[in-house]
């Protein structure tokens, strides 16, 4: 079994990554393979709402790191999404990733069938619940 963690923090190895690593520690004790993807050093452009993915089950934008991250997500058995909370919402990078992934998944819901998911939010004040529900 393999679990992918995606950290939407702008800071590499920040609190969000630490939270995902805490989840990974428990999973690894059970013999589960884990991999952390940090969006901090990756460019993810926003969705263009072109719906060209409707027939392909893949985003047609190829100029950024989305496809590589999304392919790893699809290949995994489990997914942990993590984001800091900015203005009562997930980070801009996580939002861009979720919007693009969301359109593909809405058009092809079978892609996530039988996958286990969890989310974590690094939050100091309000907005944590909103961020977790969005993820």
Predicted regions and their residues:
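Short, glycine-/small-residue-rich phosphate/pyrophosphate-handling segment
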Residues: 92-93, 107-135
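N-terminal beta1-alpha1-beta2 submodule of the flavodoxin-like/Rossmannoid cofactor-binding fold
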Residues: 1-107
